[in-house]
Structure formats: C-alpha cells, structure tokens
C-alpha cells in the first residue's frame, strides 16, 4: 500500500480538502493501492473537523469528508509521499523530521499553474480558488505516483 499525506498548517483547510479530493479521484479511477491522509504542522486545531469553508466547497462538489479531524504531522510519521501546501510547511516538515524517508513535494509541483504555493483560505477566504488549485493538481499527482511506484489502474 502506497501512503500519501497532504500537509498544511492547521489541517483544517487545505490539506483535508486535498485529502478528500484525492480520495474521490482515486475512487473514481478505481485505484485501491494508495492510502491518503492529511496532517498539520501546527497544534492549534487538533481534533477539529475541517473548516466550514472547506466543508462547504467539498459539499458543493459532492465530495465526502465524513469523519475527518485535524491531526499533527509528527517526527515518527512514515509516508511514501508527503505533499505540502506551501514552502513554509516544507520547512516545518523538515524541521519536525530532518531524516524524512518519504518523497517530499509541494502540491503545485503537479500543476500547470505559475504559483508555487497554495494560499491559505483561512486567511484569504478563497476556498473556491484553493479548490480549483487542488483539483487541477491531484490528477497529475496520481499519474506521477502510479508511474513512480509502478502501480496499475484497474
């Protein structure tokens, strides 16, 4: 089983949105060999469900997020692919786990966009814009993982 963790600051806006979108895309493509989760590098929102803005945009697009709660990225976490939402979180991940084993990327490395960081809608309130960024990046990420991990689509 290949493991993927999306990481943002509080694990209530961007990374749970990416987790839910990725899960739906994997389900739609009948890919069962990839397990997806999300984490935060900050402790403020531990145990909380996704932000109401994230819930609203996911509901609008019929993407389930049932049972999701904020979890902390920890030094002993072991994922094959760690997908950070911005450079600040890349830096935080490296500080939390300097000997990280999994491959670390920023989500927008899998996008055709010129932006390099997914802005935090907690501050911008632009949940629709973040949804579009995440949505457009996840298919490319899935294709990369399939090729990189030598998986097959069923």
Swiss-Prot record:
<dbReference type="InterPro" id="IPR036196">
    <property type="entry name" value="Ptyr_pPase_sf"/>
</dbReference>
<dbReference type="Pfam" id="PF01451">
    <property type="entry name" value="LMWPc"/>
</dbReference>
<dbReference type="InterPro" id="IPR023485">
    <property type="entry name" value="Ptyr_pPase"/>
</dbReference>
<feature type="active site" description="Proton donor">
    <location>
        <position position="120"/>
    </location>
</feature>
<dbReference type="InterPro" id="IPR050438">
    <property type="entry name" value="LMW_PTPase"/>
</dbReference>
<dbReference type="GO" id="GO:0004725">
    <property type="term" value="F:protein tyrosine phosphatase activity"/>
</dbReference>
<keyword id="KW-0904">Protein phosphatase</keyword>
<comment type="function">
    <text>Dephosphorylates the phosphotyrosine-containing proteins.</text>
</comment>
<keyword id="KW-0378">Hydrolase</keyword>
<comment type="similarity">
    <text>Belongs to the low molecular weight phosphotyrosine protein phosphatase family.</text>
</comment>
<dbReference type="InterPro" id="IPR017867">
    <property type="entry name" value="Tyr_phospatase_low_mol_wt"/>
</dbReference>
<feature type="active site">
    <location>
        <position position="14"/>
    </location>
</feature>
<feature type="active site" description="Nucleophile">
    <location>
        <position position="8"/>
    </location>
</feature>
<protein>
    <recommendedName>
        <fullName>Low molecular weight protein-tyrosine-phosphatase PtpA</fullName>
        <ecNumber>3.1.3.48</ecNumber>
    </recommendedName>
</protein>
């Amino acid at each position: 089983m290949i493991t993927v963790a999306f990481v943002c600051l509080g694990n209530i806006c961007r990374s749970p949105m990416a987790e839910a979108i990725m899960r739906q895309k994997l389900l739609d493509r009948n890919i069962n060999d990839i397990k997806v989760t999300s984490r935060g590098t900050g402790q403020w929102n531990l145990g909380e469900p996704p932000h109401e803005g994230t819930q609203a945009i996911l509901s609008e697009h019929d993407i389930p997020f049932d049972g999701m709660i904020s979890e902390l990225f920890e030094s002993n976490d072991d994922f094959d692919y760690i997908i950070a939402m911005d450079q600040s979180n890349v830096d935080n991940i490296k500080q939390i786990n300097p000997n990280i084993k999994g491959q670390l990327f920023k989500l927008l490395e899998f996008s055709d966009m010129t932006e390099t960081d997914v802005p935090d809608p907690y501050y911008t309130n632009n949940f629709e814009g973040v949804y579009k960024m995440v949505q457009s990046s996840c298919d490319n990420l899935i294709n990369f993982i399939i090729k990189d991990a030598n998986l097959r689509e069923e």
